[in-house]
Amino acid sequence: MQEFSRQFDRMANADLPDKLEGHDQSQAEMMDEQCILVGSNDQVIGSMSKVECHFGQGNRHRAFSVLLFDSSGRMLVQKRSTEKITFPGVWANSCCSHPLDIPSENSDPIQGVVKAACRKLEQELGIAISVTSKWQFNHIGTFEYRCRWNDSWIEHEIDH
């Protein structure tokens, strides 16, 4: 069902890939990943590609932010790559992204964001999943926010 839904979404939004022209190829490919659409209480209502979730008026979807602290209590912040499509070159938290509409990340909200965080910590910071899977993540709550980058790109997320 997911594959049919993705193919239908691509046909219905055939002009969206044009919005990615001129962007880094690997970043553009990640924009095809399926985010988890949620209602205002973080209840799952469907899935949609990252590009559709972040383009135009945006669509509310589940996300996460990881705050990493060292033994002295200092938080790691990172400057987002200038190749990022949304919010390039901006200073941000240690790691942020989205759980995807895949079995390991789309069932339980908290466990899903932990699995997604481990995946992205490896991809973005090079911290192996074999290391992060042993960590104890502390879920400190959720909040909803909207933040526009420019006329085209926006965030609208329930962030864990």
Question: Where does each model-flagged region fall?
Answer:
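Short secondary-structure junctions
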Residues: L125-W135
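Acidic, metal-coordinating catalytic segment for phosphate/diphosphate chemistry
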Residues: K19-S72, R80
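Conserved Nudix-box catalytic region and its N-terminal flanking loop in Nudix hydrolases
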Residues: V51-I127
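Cytosolic, low-complexity regulatory segments enriched in Ser/Pro/Gly with interspersed Lys/Arg
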Residues: M1-E21
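Active-site-adjacent beta-strand/loop module that shapes the phosphate/pyrophosphate-binding cleft
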Residues: D42, S72, W135-H160
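Sterically constrained small-residue positions within well-ordered secondary structures
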Residues: S26-A28, Q57, K84, S130, ...
